[in-house]
């Protein structure tokens, strides 16, 4: 059985509550004096419709990072040389709109100081708060999403802020550029979504080199034989090597943020999914900011 560890009191960071890490940090990242990359968790699990457990993922990714080397041979960088701070998890209230606004406020403060952000989810809805915060500072932003599902519903189960509406809301913000890895459609996406849907290798050609870029990775975009521990698995999918090749092709762009979401640790007793998630974060930091 997957159970939550006994909690401890929250502390205040920048006026907002964050959950202390009790000495568990991503790759042992410490709080540094002048960090350039801000890593934090959003253990959001509010609108999941199939398998629960996304709230455990931020901590599980950190635990899995203990098995990951900090050096990336692919990108020739060691992320211990990156000014990286793991700030813990946002303390959530249970009100999705309010929680997203809290995330947006935190990220806005970091973005206004020129920081890059890495968010560990939590359900995919958390991405909306991060993007909202960055957009308030940069005004112009382009977002690329890897996902097995279109996430293009106007609302789902009566909710407009849902894991099933993420791409729809990003489209409403005017920031969505491309979505790759989709194998599941609800049938009502329409021509508008067809304009965003593309193959993974075609994503870079859609991007504006003059606009900052945010990359959101829903782990269910990957092949479930590699990542079974997700909330809504779909057959087929992207390989780990393909994601790394995407990282390589995006290095020429100004990547301002990255997230890895929808991990569901209780659904993968082997822990392999969380290791993949930790590796993606490590390689992403090395590729974009190393």
Predicted features along the sequence, with ranges:
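Conserved alpha-helical scaffold segments that buttress catalytic/binding sites
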Residues: 2-290
């Amino acid at each position: 059985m997957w159970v939550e560890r006994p909690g401890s009191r929250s502390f205040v960071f920048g006026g907002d509550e964050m959950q202390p890490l009790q000495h568990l940090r991503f790759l042992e990242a410490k709080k540094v004096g002048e960090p350039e990359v801000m890593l934090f968790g959003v253990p959001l699990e509010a609108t999941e419709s199939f398998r629960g457990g996304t709230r455990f993922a931020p901590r599980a990714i950190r635990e899995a990072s203990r098995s990951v080397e900090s050096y990336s041979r692919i990108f020739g960088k060691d992320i211990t040389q990156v000014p990286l701070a793991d700030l813990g998890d946002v303390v959530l209230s249970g009100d999705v709109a309010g929680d997203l606004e809290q995330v947006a406020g935190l990220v806005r403060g970091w973005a206004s100081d020129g920081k890059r952000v890495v968010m560990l989810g939590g359900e995919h809805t958390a991405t909306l708060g991060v993007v909202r915060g960055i957009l308030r500072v940069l005004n112009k932003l382009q977002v690329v999403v890897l996902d097995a599902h279109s996430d293009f519903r106007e609302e789902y189960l009566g909710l407009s802020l849902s894991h099933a509406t993420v791409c729809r809301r990003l489209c409403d913000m005017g920031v969505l550029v491309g979505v790759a890895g989709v194998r599941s459609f609800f049938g009502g996406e329409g021509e508008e979504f067809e304009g965003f849907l593309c193959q993974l290798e075609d994503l870079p050609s859609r991007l504006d080199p003059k606009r900052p870029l945010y990359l959101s990775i829903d782990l269910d975009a990957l092949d479930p034989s590699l990542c079974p521990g997700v909330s809504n698995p779909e057959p087929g999918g992207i390989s780990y090597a393909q994601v790394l090749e995407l990282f390589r092709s995006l290095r020429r762009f100004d990547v301002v943020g990255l997230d890895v979401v929808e991990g569901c640790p209780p659904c993968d007793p082997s822990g392999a999914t969380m290791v993949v998630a930790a590796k993606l974060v490590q390689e992403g930091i090395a590729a974009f900011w190393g």
